[in-house]
Amino acid sequence: MTKKLLVAIVEDDRFFRESMRRLMRSLGYTVEDFASAADFLASPRLADMACLIADVQMPAMTGIELYRHLIDAGRAIPTILVTGYPNDVDRVRVLNDGVVGYLRKPVDEEYLKGCLRAALASGASPAENA
């Protein structure tokens, strides 16, 4: 039996987080969801994450700050950022920094699927991120 890939969702909006969790599960992924970047960083399964989907605008630590924190800590996880407030400057910067996708809410499901495929194809196996 093939092990399902673990996708992390970090989103402070409960409705969007639950909706994204249902979508990821319907696509066959195992999902861990978190209400904040701090909750995600405290997860004992951090090293098992194959992909991270994070909201850009969150209190305390934004999705962009979370991505940079992971890079600085040597824990690169293929990341897709989602936002209700898209900004071309941020989009260009994070894509140049290695983020796989920068998506506007509401998320286009087909585009998200393409970003997930790219993220999972580009990322190292979770064991390599430990």
Please tell me what each predicted stretch does:
Residues 35-36, 62-66:
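Acidic catalytic/metal-coordinating carboxylates
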Residues 33-51:
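Acidic, metal-coordinating helix/loop segments flanking the phosphotransfer/catalytic sites
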Residues 14-32:
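Two-component/phosphorelay signaling modules centered on CheY-like receiver
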Residues 54-55:
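Active-site T/S-Asp motif of two-component receiver
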Residues 89, 107-117:
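C-terminal output helix
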Residues 58:
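Receiver (REC) domain active-site loop signature in two-component systems and cognate sites
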Residues 65, 86-101:
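Alpha4 helix (beta4-alpha4-beta5 surface) of REC/receiver domains from two-component response regulators
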